């Protein structure tokens, strides 16, 4: 919350200069942000964020962390998507977004035609990995031991689908939490440059 308070102070009198993207489905609990699908918590978390940011709207309301087809179905058919639609109709968010690490779940979301912005984990190493519901697998050294020479077809299909449908992509984990820039930690076996990571 402190970071949002500080950003809110900085935005005063300058809000129109910034494009804000914020998560739906996060709450502050036990000293950290956590994912929730409980609609009362989703509403409370979003209103708290607007208040702390000293604004009445965001450019993107990003539905947080949808990494399985089951979770996407629950979000899409349940009160979370309905709430996102309401926020958009009220002008509290301009675009509905979604964050994911799983190309299969992300593709289903993009196919709905309601997701206008996708936050997705993209970098030269993750792009070699197959779809999965466990995002921790993206960091697991054993998943980089085989011959990985081509982009995963599901990821490639997702990026092409977003391009064709005009869905914006915001990138997370471009440097893999810094691991890709480290010769010791990079799954590529050597340190990559920032330019290589932002392929």
Question: Model-derived features: where do they sit?
Answer:
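Active-site mouth loops of central-metabolism enzymes
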Residues: 24-43, 69-73, 183-192
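Short, well-ordered amphipathic alpha-helical segments that serve as non-catalytic structural scaffolds
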Residues: 40-50, 83
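N-terminal binding-site loop/beta-alpha segment at the start of enzyme catalytic domains
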Residues: 1-22, 56, 83, 89
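Beta/alpha (TIM)-barrel catalytic core signal, keyed to glycine-rich beta->alpha loops juxtaposed to Asp/Glu
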Residues: 10, 66-199
């Amino acid at each position: 919350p402190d970071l949002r308070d500080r950003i809110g102070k900085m935005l005063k009198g300058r809000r129109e200069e910034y494009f804000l993207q914020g998560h739906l489905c996060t709450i502050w609990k036990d000293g950290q942000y956590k994912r929730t699908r409980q609609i009362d918590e989703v509403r409370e978390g979003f209103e708290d964020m607007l208040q702390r940011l000293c604004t009445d709207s965001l450019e993107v309301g990003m539905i947080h962390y949808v990494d399985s087809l089951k979770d996407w179905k629950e979000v899409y058919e349940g009160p979370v998507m309905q709430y996102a639609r309401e926020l958009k109709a009220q002008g509290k968010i301009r675009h509905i977004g979604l964050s994911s690490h799983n190309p299969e779940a992300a593709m289903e979301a993009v196919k709905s035609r309601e997701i206008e912005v996708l936050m997705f984990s993209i970098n030269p190493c993750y792009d070699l990995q197959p779809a999965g519901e466990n995002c921790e697998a993206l960091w697991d050294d054993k998943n980089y031991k085989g011959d990985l020479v081509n982009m995963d077809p599901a990821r490639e299909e997702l990026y092409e689908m977003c391009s064709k449908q005009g869905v914006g992509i915001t990138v997370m984990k471009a440097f893999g939490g810094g691991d890709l820039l480290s010769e010791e930690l990079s799954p590529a076996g050597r340190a990559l440059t920032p330019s290589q990571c932002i392929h």
